[in-house]
């Protein structure tokens, strides 16, 4: 027979790692629910983050990246998810030349990016303070905001126009530094090398799916370290 499982995961799952699924099975309907244990949460080590509310008689088997829950399910039984969502710094394969020496940021199932509207122009001069982040991951701030999308058209055909939309979103604020633009250096194509002057700052990162919704500006996923 077929049994219905409803999910209350929605957008909160992507932002907070929490969700719930409810069963409408009649009393003592015995079947198995297979739940994927995502790699971003630790894979099979994340099975303890999945619980059946008020039930300790449901068997649990972990196999091939899934948690199998088997038992006599009742109408209204709820399976809760509470996956950890730490921020990870990610490096590309070293043979990907464009991203050599750079780092990207991932939290839960979402990759993040930097846009010029938040961080200023010339994003290639913006560096993530990887040493500080690696030594103290708590220095990365995870913030819940209301993201304001919307952009005016760039021509009479409506190119680039984005309707005004507000939606809840999670951003990351990371320690960073910028290379100071020296007029003597930027006025010529070449100049004598000297160490870059650093200006301490922070970088604001938004979920990758949200970029290009606030007018024309730069975007990068990988930041120099």
State where each predicted segment sits.
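Single conserved hydrophobic/aromatic residue that forms the stacking wall/gate
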Residues: 1-16
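C-terminal beta-rich recognition modules with glycine/proline-rich loops and embedded aromatic residues
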Residues: 10, 22-26, 45, 62, ...
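Aromatic/hydrophobic beta-strand junction motif of beta-rich domains
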Residues: 14-17, 21-23, 35-37
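Beta-strand-rich binding/interaction modules
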Residues: 28-54
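Residue-level marker for the onset of beta-strands and adjacent loop->beta junctions
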Residues: 31, 65-67, 101
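Short strand-turn-strand beta-turns centered on an Asx-Gly dipeptide
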Residues: 49-60, 108
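Beta-strand-rich interaction surfaces with strong enrichment in secreted/lumenal proteins
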Residues: 58, 67-71
């Amino acid at each position: 027979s077929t049994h219905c499982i409803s999910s209350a995961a929605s957008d909160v799952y992507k932002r907070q790692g929490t969700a719930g699924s409810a069963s409408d099975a009649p009393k003592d309907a015995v079947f198995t629910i297979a739940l994927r244990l995502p790699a971003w949460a630790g894979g099979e080590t994340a099975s303890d983050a999945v619980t059946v509310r008020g039930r300790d008689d449901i068997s649990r088997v972990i196999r091939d990246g899934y948690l199998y829950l088997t038992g006599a399910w009742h109408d209204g039984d709820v399976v809760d998810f509470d996956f950890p969502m730490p921020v990870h710094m990610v490096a590309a394969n070293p043979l990907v030349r464009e991203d050599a020496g750079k780092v990207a940021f991932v939290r839960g199932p979402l990759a993040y990016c930097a846009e010029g509207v938040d961080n200023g122009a010339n994003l290639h001069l913006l560096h993530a303070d990887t040493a500080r982040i690696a030594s103290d991951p708590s220095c990365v701030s995870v913030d819940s905001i209301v993201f304001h999308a919307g952009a005016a058209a760039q021509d009479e055909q409506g190119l680039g126009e984005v309707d005004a939309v507000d939606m809840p979103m999670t951003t990351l604020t990371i320690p960073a530094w910028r290379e100071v633009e020296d007029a003597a250096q930027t006025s010529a194509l070449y100049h004598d090398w000297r160490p870059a002057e650093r200006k301490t700052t922070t970088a604001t990162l938004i979920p990758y799916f949200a970029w290009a919704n606030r007018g024309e500006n730069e975007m990068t996923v990988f930041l120099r370290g």
